[in-house]
């Protein structure tokens, strides 16, 4: 009788693999806030490299034509009384969310300007390129309890590109968005229309169409820990009266929120909404968030300015509050995790990082469609070292 684990064949004995040998576990990254409570990491003050605009048809323009100018109402103690429901839905042109733009617009800008980057192609080869919104999700992850995310990563010519992937749950949520939520989204854009003018020194004109295809985007350079960053984010407006007219310190972020009536409501606001506002504005160096508080009828009854660098003070003594150090340390840890995981230089290979609340960040590998996100026109231009796309790129390419 043969003993278990061996096989006799022509006088040759082969030793079988031990049955208790386990495959090496896939790498993962924990997200528990307690693991990231160390000192605040180094974060270089963001500097603006350039900008671009998207027009009413969502077409790219390498200039500031879509930039708007902050023009708040007079501070005479009266309620602004902005009707945020005005124009809905007849003067509303929402962006087609079925079009997955990925990094395309930012890559278009990068092709046009990569030769002008300080440090040249060598700097870009060690950098991480992404949208500001993707970094915002990373910052808030240790405190997020409801929504997961997926980030696709590809390495090409040394540069690591990060692009968000819509999760199945997020897609279902988007396609079944209730009418009230769609109206609340409109209200946020309508508030911007009341607070911004097309030219400095001119009053806002809220009678026009709200078209969410239009966007002005700033392109910024920074560094978190030892990770060089090049990222872009949409900017609501610039303040002509700001102490410094140098971007990004002249930019203003505009937000809306429901009116608060109790200390408990304010505490919840500081714990949850203010965290996201801080993360979104701290990353690009936007100094102020101006919030319009609306009543149940949809009218803005008050305005309040939240300086970005003072937001943490609202939760500093709250045991269940958030900590900027935790947010930034986790983001730095994720970037290290991504850099160490996405090691193969191949624009068609995607490392998909996935996270659900309560669990760690996990990773899986995929090749080509539907996960590959670096468009052929970009890969071709970079490979051939062309200064611009070989053809006019479209988000659908």
Curated annotation (Swiss-Prot):
Its EC number is 3.6.1.-, 3.1.13.-. Keywords: Exonuclease, Hydrolase, Magnesium, Metal-binding, Nuclease, Nucleotide-binding, Nucleus, Phosphoprotein, RNA-binding. Mg(2+) 2 binds at residues 192, 234, 236. One of its GO terms (cellular component) is cytosol. Residues 1-20 have a biased composition (Basic and acidic residues). Substrate binds at residues 58, 101, 131-133, 217, 234, 255, 280. Binds 2 magnesium ions. Mg(2+) 1 binds at residues 192, 236, 253-254. It holds the Pfam family RAI1. One of its GO terms (biological process) is nuclear mRNA surveillance. It is found in: Nucleus. The modification Phosphothreonine is found at residue 392. It catalyses: a 5'-end triphospho-ribonucleoside in mRNA + H2O = a 5'-end phospho-ribonucleoside in mRNA + diphosphate + H(+); a 5'-end NAD(+)-phospho-ribonucleoside in mRNA + H2O = a 5'-end phospho-ribonucleoside in mRNA + NAD(+) + H(+); a 5'-end NAD(+)-phospho-ribonucleoside in snoRNA + H2O = a 5'-end phospho-ribonucleoside in snoRNA + NAD(+) + H(+); a 5'-end (N(7)-methyl 5'-triphosphoguanosine)-ribonucleoside-ribonucleotide in mRNA + H2O = a (N(7)-methyl 5'-triphosphoguanosine)-nucleoside + a 5'-end phospho-ribonucleoside in mRNA + H(+). Residues 1-37, 67-88 are annotated as: Disordered. It comes from the Eukaryota. GO terms for molecular function: 5'-3' exonuclease activity; magnesium ion binding; mRNA 5'-diphosphatase activity; mRNA binding; nucleotide binding; RNA NAD+-cap (NAD+-forming) hydrolase activity. The modification Phosphoserine is found at residue 394. Its cofactor is Mg(2+). Belongs to the DXO/Dom3Z family. Decapping enzyme for NAD-capped RNAs: specifically hydrolyzes the nicotinamide adenine dinucleotide (NAD) cap from a subset of RNAs by removing the entire NAD moiety from the 5'-end of an NAD-capped RNA. The NAD-cap is present at the 5'-end of some RNAs and snoRNAs. In contrast to the canonical 5'-end N7 methylguanosine (m7G) cap, the NAD cap promotes mRNA decay. Preferentially acts on NAD-capped transcripts in response to environmental stress. This is Decapping and exoribonuclease protein. It comes from Bos taurus. The gene is DXO.
């Amino acid at each position: 009788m043969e003993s278990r684990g061996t096989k006799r064949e022509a006088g040759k004995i082969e030793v079988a693999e031990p049955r208790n040998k386990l495959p090496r576990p896939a790498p993962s990254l924990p997200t528990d806030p307690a693991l990231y409570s160390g000192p605040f990491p180094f974060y270089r003050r963001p500097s603006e490299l350039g900008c671009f605009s998207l027009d009413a048809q969502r077409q790219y323009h390498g200039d500031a034509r879509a930039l708007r100018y902050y023009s708040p109402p007079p501070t005479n103690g009266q309620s602004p009384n902005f009707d945020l429901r005005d124009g809905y839905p007849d003067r509303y042109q929402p962006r087609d969310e079925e079009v997955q733009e990925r990094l395309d617009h930012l890559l278009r800008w990068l092709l046009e300007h990569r030769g002008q980057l300080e440090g040249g192609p060598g700097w870009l080869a060690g950098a991480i390129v992404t949208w500001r919104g993707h970094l915002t999700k990373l910052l808030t992850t240790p405190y997020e309890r409801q929504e997961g995310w997926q980030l696709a990563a590809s390495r090409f010519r040394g540069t690591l590109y990060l692009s968000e992937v819509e999760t199945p749950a997020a897609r279902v949520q988007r396609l079944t968005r209730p009418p009230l939520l769609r109206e609340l989204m409109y209200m946020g854009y309508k508030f911007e229309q009341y607070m911004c003018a097309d030219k400095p020194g001119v009053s806002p004109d809220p009678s026009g169409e709200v078209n969410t295809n239009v966007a002005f985007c700033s392109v910024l350079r920074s560094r978190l820990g030892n990770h060089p960053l090049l990222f872009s984010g949409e900017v609501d407006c610039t303040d002509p009266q700001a102490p410094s007219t140098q971007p990004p310190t002249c930019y203003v972020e505009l937000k809306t929120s429901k009116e608060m009536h109790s200390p408990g409501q304010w505490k919840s606001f500081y714990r949850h909404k203010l965290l996201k506002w801080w993360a979104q504005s701290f990353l690009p160096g936007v100094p102020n968030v101006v919030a319009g508080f609306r009543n149940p009828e949809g009218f803005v009854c008050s305005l309040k300015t939240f300086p970005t660098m003072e937001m943490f003070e609202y939760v500093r003594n709250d045991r269940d509050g958030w900590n900027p150090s935790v947010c930034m340390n986790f983001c730095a840890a994720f970037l290290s995790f991504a850099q160490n995981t996405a090691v193969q230089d191949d624009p068609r290979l995607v490392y998909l990082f996935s996270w659900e609340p309560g669990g760690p960040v996990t990773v899986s590998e995929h090749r080509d469609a539907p996960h590959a996100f670096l468009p052929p026109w970009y890969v071709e231009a970079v490979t051939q070292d062309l200064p611009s796309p070989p053809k006019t790129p479209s988000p659908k390419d």
